[in-house]
């Protein structure tokens, strides 16, 4: 199974009681995934596709590999977050994923099924959104060193993207270094739980094609001049 997917999230719409809105963080990731998946069907799968059931439910599980490229918007540009190591904790570009879920198949014709799936992808990383540490207290001084006093440091975007809380920004939207120092880096980021990994839920609608030996003669390359009707069943 090969997939291209986008995941994203942002704090501003969150319930104020969740304490996420003040972080003002967001991300977007567009990734590629390749996985090997096995299915267990409610009704037995027939040897010949022409005799398969018109409707079937199934469970599935598998293992795969996905890219992991979270980005955040700074001005009009989307910046790659992984190379910046905002939390001083490097993570891999490729991650393991474990697809699980349920699905349904409806027989459209001899060679194709309409499929609908509800699936959840488990992972072994907490950095699909580039956010893991509870706050910046352990690395805020490194962020400030890269930023400088007024953004003249060697890598100022690290601090700009790590701290978006408006309480620690100046009137121009730039990090207020003195406020950050006075706070001691106790500025919230993530859960801070090492054992909690990221995952994502999706709904998939697709077409499944059965590549039986007679598909080329009977469906794709059949003589359409002599045969006027389209044969579905």
Language model features by range: what are they?
Residues 1-77:
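Gram-negative (and chloroplast) outer-membrane scaffold detector with strong preference
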Residues 12-21, 75-81, 131-140, 224-225:
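Flexible, surface-exposed loop regions and adjacent strand-edge segments
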């Amino acid at each position: 199974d090969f997939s291209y997917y986008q995941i994203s999230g942002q704090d501003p719409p969150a319930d104020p009681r969740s304490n996420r809105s003040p972080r003002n963080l967001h991300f977007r990731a567009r990734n590629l995934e390749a996985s090997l998946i096995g299915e267990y069907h409610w009704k037995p799968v027939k040897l010949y596709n022409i005799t398969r059931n018109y409707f079937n439910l199934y469970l599935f599980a598998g293992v795969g590999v996905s890219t992991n490229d979270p980005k955040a918007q700074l001005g009009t540009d989307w910046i790659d977050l992984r190379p910046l190591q905002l939390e001083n904790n490097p993570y891999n570009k490729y991650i393991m994923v474990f697809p699980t879920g349920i699905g349904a198949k409806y027989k459209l014709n001899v060679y194709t099924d309409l499929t609908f799936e509800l699936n959840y992808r488990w992972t072994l990383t907490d950095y699909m959104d580039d956010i893991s540490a509870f706050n910046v207290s352990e690395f805020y001084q490194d962020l400030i060193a890269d930023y400088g006093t007024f953004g003249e440091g060697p890598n100022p975007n690290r601090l700009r993207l790590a701290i978006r809380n408006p309480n620690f920004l100046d009137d121009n939207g730039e990090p207020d270094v003195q406020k950050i120092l006075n706070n001691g880096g106790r500025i919230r980021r993530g859960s801070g739980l090492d054992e909690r990994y990221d995952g994502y839920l999706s709904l998939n609608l697709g077409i499944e094609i059965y590549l039986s030996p007679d598909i080329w003669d009977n469906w794709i390359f059949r003589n359409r001049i002599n045969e006027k009707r389209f044969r579905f069943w």
